[in-house]
């Protein structure tokens, strides 16, 4: 059985005046350690699907299974990393990083040492007693990654985590996240609008069409490209070829959206 099984998921939002189907008949599998990306026009249901996988929304139809069971935060310890770091400004970096362990009631001397040990791995030296406002945007996002990984999640969900950063910081964090997830054998799902980011970080890209969101096309990243650090992958001719292919498909979908 696959690690992540999305079984013909459809989700519809209802209001007093209308109903809107955000995603329709989404079906795919991902194995442990896979990195997959959702790419597509704005409003195609990528974040809705991510929320369904996280167990935050129950789908109107279909189901999601993680290791054969429906998503459950206590059982699966799902990690979420968002566009903003959402560090609590009144808490120190140490307190922020340990927050998930405290909430899950799994904070021990051993788990504390392991969590705080992530900080120097991520280039954050002597920051434990500092507060978020004392760190740069890139440093805060690194601290947020440490907080996300501290409870040892089985699945990591990334909702445009680099989009608010400058390009140099973004490239650096892409490498860091990629290397960390490979080292710890984490399964990850990335939502992004950035074609290059999706190619550089993923094993598989799901390109979504809009209204309602459906899987328009699936791109499997060549193994030699998927094994490279994102920065190195961006230099490869095969990266540019795949970028152009996906860009044309995405551009066609966006034109269709504008014409409706």
From Swiss-Prot:
CDD domains: ABC_NrtD_SsuB_transporters (cd03293). InterPro entries: AAA+_ATPase, ABC_transporter-like_ATP-bd, ABC_transporter-like_CS, ABC_transporter_ATP-bind, P-loop_NTPase. It comes from Bacillus subtilis (strain 168). Pfam families: ABC_tran. Its EC number is 7.-.-.-. SUPFAM superfamilies: P-loop containing nucleoside triphosphate hydrolases. It comes from the Bacteria. The lineage of its organism: Bacteria, Bacillati, Bacillota, Bacilli, Bacillales. PROSITE patterns: ABC_TRANSPORTER_1, ABC_TRANSPORTER_2. Residues 4-231 form the ABC transporter domain. ATP binds at residues 40-47. GO terms for molecular function: ATP binding; ATP hydrolysis activity. This is Uncharacterized ABC transporter ATP-binding protein YtlC. Keywords: ATP-binding, Nucleotide-binding, Translocase, Transport. The keyword Nucleotide-binding applies. The keyword Translocase applies. Belongs to the ABC transporter superfamily.
């Amino acid at each position: 059985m696959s690690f992540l099984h999305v079984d013909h998921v459809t989700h519809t939002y209802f209001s007093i005046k209308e109903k809107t189907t955000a995603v329709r008949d989404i079906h795919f599998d991902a194995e442990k350690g896979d990195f997959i990306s959702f790419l597509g026009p704005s409003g195609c249901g990528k974040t809705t699907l991510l929320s369904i996988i996280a167990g935050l929304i129950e789908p109107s139809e279909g189901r999601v299974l993680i290791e054969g069971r429906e998503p459950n935060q206590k059982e699966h310890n799902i990690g979420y990393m968002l566009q903003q770091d959402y560090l609590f400004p009144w808490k120190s970096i140490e307190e922020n990083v340990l927050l998930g362990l405290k909430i899950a009631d799994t904070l021990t001397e051993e788990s504390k040492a392991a969590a705080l040990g992530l900080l120097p791995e991520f280039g954050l030296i002597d920051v434990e007693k500092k507060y978020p406002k004392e760190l740069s945007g890139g440093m805060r996002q690194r601290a947020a990654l440490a907080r996300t990984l501290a409870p040892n999640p089985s699945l990591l969900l990334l909702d445009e985590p680099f989009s608010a950063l400058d390009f140099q910081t973004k490239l650096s964090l892409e490498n860091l996240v990629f290397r960390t997830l490979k080292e710890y054998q984490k399964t990850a799902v990335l939502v992004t609008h950035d074609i290059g980011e999706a190619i550089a970080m993923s094993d598989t890209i799901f390109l979504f069409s809009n209204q309602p969101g459906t899987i328009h096309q699936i791109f499997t990243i060549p193994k030699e490209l998927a094994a490279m650090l994102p920065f190195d992958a961006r230099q490869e001719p095969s990266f540019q070829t795949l970028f152009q292919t996906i860009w044309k498909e995405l551009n066609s979908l966006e034109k269709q959206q504008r014409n409706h």
